[in-house]
From Swiss-Prot:
Cited function: Transcription factor; part of the gene cluster that mediates the biosynthesis of the neurotoxin verrucosidin, a methylated alpha-pyrone polyketide that inhibits oxidative phosphorylation in mitochondria and thereby causes neurological diseases.
Protein name, UniProt field: Transcription factor verF
Zinc finger (C2H2-type): 19-41, 47-69
Gene Ontology biological-process entries: DNA-templated transcription
UniProt xrefs under Pfam families: Fungal_trans (PF04082), Zn_clus (PF00172)
Region (Disordered) location: 120-151
DNA-binding segment(s): 83-109
Keyword vocabulary terms for this entry: DNA-binding, Metal-binding, Nucleus, Repeat, Transcription, Transcription regulation, Zinc, Zinc-finger
CDD domains, alphabetized: fungal_TF_MHR (cd12148), GAL4 (cd00067)
Classification via Gene3D superfamilies: Classic Zinc Finger, Zn(2)-C6 fungal-type DNA-binding domain
Biased composition (Polar residues): 120-129
Source organism (scientific name): Penicillium polonicum
Length: 730
């Protein structure tokens, strides 16, 4: 019999314990209570006393112990004199690491109740004793350190070198793990509970058969708030809490499975201490056992080395203000731990990905991904997490990840693509640009004002230049509808589509700076001679067969798509006699491309506002506005809301596994169209008025008839404009 749980937001939710232990089925109201309880099912004791060798499972027990600790009384009673294997076999143990018996048999030698004893003993003997009250405060306020090593800059786990680490993960055959453990490389979305329907949102959903409604509720909220969650389409806090609960349950279940499977894998994976007998035992004795069976631990170490590099070797005027220390190293390992990477990427896919969808979810592999991209995606996931500590911890690493992304060799290389070449083999370059774009996102919406200005004025300009170096015209598809299934290369399609969407989103961010910060555009429409993005059904297909089928269905061989560029589509949109075929094509391509077209209209309006006496632009802008409205209505009537991939976060029928497929904030494209329409109308009225004087006096009058201040970090003047439109014209 299935158990019915109350929906989030119902009266009984606040009293119902919703977090369940998968081992003993006990329930808890708070997630941290469940985490504390899970520790009772293991032998790990992460809270350690620096004065003696005492180790505890809970911080409050350590706190009570420190009040009475005399600095060594418990050492003799807590130290294990025999390894686990010798204890089980009831044999004498030499107490070495590894002991003589385990070394002779080639078995894994573990001392489960005295993890890291030699490390703590050496630290205790070389460190002066601090006053007890100070030690109590320090040990209790700081969380238990994650696995740390003093030799990360020269030695990797399993005796790997940096060269081995850089080559790891580039091929499915280049792995040290049992195939069964590879199930964690590209996990599916967790089994989220069905999100509750909270009723209509405060704004009307634009995807409907009606004309675009005259309201700017979303843009009003967008320009009056800061932060990714407050600005974009990330669901309610209750919905994100449910996602977090399911992610935690899945990660805990996987962790327990790995721990339980370790005895069976112990004979297959030698102990790192056996493989490296000459290494410092303190560097690996503190590593949790599940890390040695977790392929993502390599990515954690890669990120750690990159962070250490940008912190210790700061360039001039570096934005990184941190100093490298063992505490910072431990904090980095804890934030980018394998379990946190999985959790943060779970938030990225379910909450954030629909808003900026240029990473191909079905083929994304965490092990093969660049560490810079993985770190940037993890930061976005932490920013949209419902847990405040995740949000605060993410800000610590904003500037570090920004620095390591923009100094990355792949990002700064001079590589250019050939249109006829194999773009799929240049995935590292594409991922480097994706990482740079994600950095621009989280810094512009979550960073400090100085970070926002730096991104807008310098980093984004570098990103646009890198896109031009790659070649915007290289972002084109082959005519897949002319290819048979045996000729269709899914990876090649995915790489080209990622590049097209990446350049599209770069243009959209450029347009956002134009609209909301009144910054002159860095990209011009005439240079965007690339294909438009294929429909979402093609990009979201989970198999090569399904993708090939969707391409044939939406984009037949004779359709205009294969011969039309983004520039050509916009030029056609500005004509007064737009053909029916082009209308149907643009409606078929979906909301992302329509959002890009309405953003292009804003770019033209900025040029119109900034030009002197160029009123000939008024007619093309009016044509584009009229044609876009008709195409959006055609799209809304052809692809009704509630059908994949045109579902929204408010849809009551959305399935948990389809959260990443929903439409993001670009479903509010009609509001962008309405803002452009109102601005064009105001410019038309202002254009008919004649100046009072032939020569305008020096330092008098506004710089611009609509927005007076250029390159403004705050969106206040745009919000004032929107409020004025809603008050006087709607």
């Amino acid at each position: 019999m299935s158990t019915e749980y109350p929906l989030v937001g119902s009266p009984e939710t606040s009293e119902y314990p919703k977090y369940e232990c998968s081992l003993c089925l006990k329930r808890y109201k708070r997630r941290e209570h469940l985490f504390r309880h899970i520790g009772s099912h293991t032998s790990q004791r992460p809270y350690q006393c620096n004065s003696c060798d005492g180790a505890f499972q809970r911080a409050d027990v350590l706190k009570r112990h420190l009040r009475t600790c005399d600095g060594g009384a418990s050492r003799a009673s807590t130290r294990r004199r025999a390894c686990d294997r010798c204890v089980r076999q009831k044999k004498a143990c030499s107490s070495h690491q590894p002991c003589h018996s385990c070394a002779k048999k080639g078995a894994q030698c573990l001392y489960s109740t005295d993890t890291g004893y030699s490390s703590r003993l050496s630290q205790h003997s070389s460190t002066n004793h601090t006053p007890k009250d100070q030690e109590l405060s320090t040990q209790f306020t700081n969380p238990p350190p994650p696995p740390s090593t003093s030799t990360f800059n020269t030695m990797m786990p399993w005796g790997l070198t940096m060269e081995d680490l850089q080559n790891f993960g580039t091929s499915p055959t280049n792995t040290f793990f049992d195939p069964a453990s590879m199930q964690y490389t590209s996990p599916t979305l967790p089994d989220f509970s069905v999100l509750p329907f909270e009723g209509p949102a405060t704004f009307e959903t634009p995807v409907s058969s009606d004309p675009p409604r005259k309201s700017l509720h979303f843009l009003d909220k967008f320009t009056s708030n800061t932060g990714l969650v407050s600005s974009f389409d990330c669901g309610t806090h209750e919905q994100r809490e449910q996602i977090a609960a399911r992610l935690d349950q899945q990660i805990l279940s996987e962790l327990q499975q790995r721990i339980m499977s370790m005895p069976a894998l112990g004979m297959d994976i030698p102990s790192p201490l056996i493989m490296e007998n000459n290494s410092d035992t303190s560097s690996t004795s503190d590593l949790p056992l599940d890390w040695f069976n977790d392929p993502l631990s390599l990515k954690t170490h890669e990120i750690l080395l990159l962070v250490e590099e940008v912190v210790t070797i700061k360039p001039r005027n570096s934005s990184v203000a941190l100093d490298w220390s063992s505490t910072l190293r431990d904090a980095c390992l804890q934030f980018f731990s394998p379990s946190n990477i999985r959790r943060f990427l779970g938030f990225y896919w379910a909450i954030w990905h629909p808003n900026v969808n240029f990473v191909h979810r079905p083929t994304f592999d965490m092990l093969a991904a660049k560490p810079t991209l993985l770190a940037a995606m993890a930061l976005i996931g932490a920013c949209v997490s419902p847990d405040m500590p995740d949000n605060e911890d993410a800000r610590t690493w904003f500037n570090c990840v920004e620095e390591m992304v923009f100094i990355d060799d792949d990002f700064n290389s001079d590589l250019t693509y050939q249109y006829s070449g194999n773009i799929a083999i240049q995935r590292r370059k594409i991922q480097a640009v994706q990482a740079a774009y994600i950095v621009c996102l989280y810094q512009n919406w979550e960073g400090a004002d100085a970070s926002k200005s730096r991104i807008r004025r310098y980093r984004f300009a570098t990103l646009v230049s890198t896109a031009r170096d790659i070649g915007i015209t290289a972002a084109r598809h082959l005519n897949y509808s002319e290819l048979g299934r045996h000729e269709f290369e899914w990876k090649e399609y995915e790489a080209r589509e990622e590049l097209i969407r990446l350049f599209t989103w770069i243009f959209l961010l450029d347009s956002a700076f134009v609209i909301f910060n009144n910054l002159p555009p860095r990209m011009v429409i005439k240079e965007i001679r690339m294909h438009m993005a294929t429909p979402e059904a093609c990009f979201q297909a989970t198999t090569a067969d399904e993708c090939h089928h969707q391409l044939h269905l939406f984009l037949p061989a004779r359709t205009l798509y294969w011969t039309t560029s983004f520039r050509g589509s916009f030029e056609s949109l500005c004509k007064d006699d737009l053909s029916v075929n082009i209308r149907h094509l643009l409606a078929t391509l979906g909301p992302l491309n329509l959002f890009a077209l309405t953003s292009a209209i804003h770019s033209q309006i900025f040029q119109f506002r900034s030009a002197v006496g160029s009123f000939q632009l008024r007619a093309p802008i009016q044509n584009a506005l009229s044609n876009w409205r008709d195409i959006w209505q055609l799209f809304s009537s052809t692809f009704p809301q509630g059908i994949t991939p045109h579902m929204t976060i408010e849809d009551p029928h959305i399935q948990p596994e389809e959260l990443w497929k929903r439409m993001g904030f670009f479903r509010y494209a009609p509001e962008y169209w309405l803002l452009a329409h109102l601005m064009a109308d105001r410019l038309a009225v202002l254009g008919t008025s004649k100046p009072e004087n032939e020569l305008e006096p020096l330092d008098e009058g506004p710089l611009d008839p609509i927005l007076n201040r250029y390159d403004q970090t705050s969106m206040r003047q745009v919000n004032d404009l929107i409020m004025g439109f809603q008050t006087f014209q709607i």
